[in-house]
Amino acid sequence: MNKIRLLPLVAASLLSLGTAAQTSFPGAETIRYEAPEGTTHAHQVRSATSFYDPGEGVAYLDSVEYYTADYVEAEDGSVYLSNPFVFFPTDTWLKLDRAGGDTLVARLPQAMFEGDDGTVFYARRMVLSDRGDGELDCLPDETETDVRFTLRGDTLALVDGGLDEQGMPRYILGLATATGGWSCYGEGLTTIVPLRYEPTQKPEGKPEQTIHFVHYNPFIEDDMDEEVPAVCDGDKIYWQLPYSSNSGETYWVVGEWRDNRITVLPQYLGVDTWSCLHLFAMPADYLPESSQLDPFDLKEMLVLNYNPSTETYESAYENQTLLVNVGPDRVYYADSYVTPRLQSLPSTSILSRPRLDTPAPSVCYSPDGRGLRQPTRHGIVLRRNADGTVVKQVAR
């Protein structure tokens, strides 16, 4: 994620009371918790420039990709957009009215969220204002209240005013109170398009068996041995990743067996509906000495070589990684599996005891041509059983 911290970005308060007095603000009873009947476009791909508060009382600006978005085209031609604020899902709907041709208009303010203390937050058109002392305010726009969208073909987009000389959106769709107090959440440069990928799914009619997916966890600095279901289908092996969403979705990845090795390519895993994310399995390298926030570098493939002495498919080199990543284009990961290996493959599969007439070389090569040694990590591992319990054992 490309984060730019605005130091400090101050929420407007009583500065906009004059504007509030001239604007009609609907009550909490007008919040739309459901959309009307119509054509639903679910799990679209949203990209945006988004503001959010990480809990510090200031706003951060972030360009986001591969977040989900839902909208409904109602029978009267209007459009209802769910959760218009990426980092503050309200589970409510913003109404966009037809304004001729492919143009839609969000007539603002619209009530979007009611706080525990009864404070109503509204979708409002807002602008950044330089206070002249090195600080910025985000204030309701005094020249115009509405924002416009276009729906052209299968693309829904916010009509933005471009960027100012500081690279900030000239106006945003913000979440604020009637008095102009900004929540530090808002959207600019929003585009919503259909998803172009199909998720990896296990083949139907094939028996599942349990295998061990072992990997290093850099955050606890230890190995994890996790029992996961797997399905073999010819020269392919499918296994369920340990990552699961709070909504209960599970995700499968597929690798292809050839020349005594398993190759895993980038692939779409599916939607995390709880976090509103599109997830991908992305090969990468872990960079333990890196100081960057996300210490991984995306790669073209992940390779697991067969080790006949342990009957295990092992990572071709240390720190090779499989990421559960948001989108396929940059590192923004939900989970990571460093130096992975597969153990206890189904005995009915050709992968469990492959022919050794074309063995994998003892020295492996990464996509950039570096000679790399086989992994040598041994010792104590953490093993997760099928019932969820975790025990320590000696790696063999």
Q: Over which residues does each language-model region extend?
A:
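C-terminal tail/sorting-segment detector
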Residues: N2-K3, L382-R396
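Tryptophan-anchored aromatic micro-motifs
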Residues: S24-E65, Y80-F85, R196-D225, I237-Y243
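Hydrophobic alpha-helical segments, especially N-terminal targeting/anchoring helices
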Residues: E73, L163, Y365-S366, R384
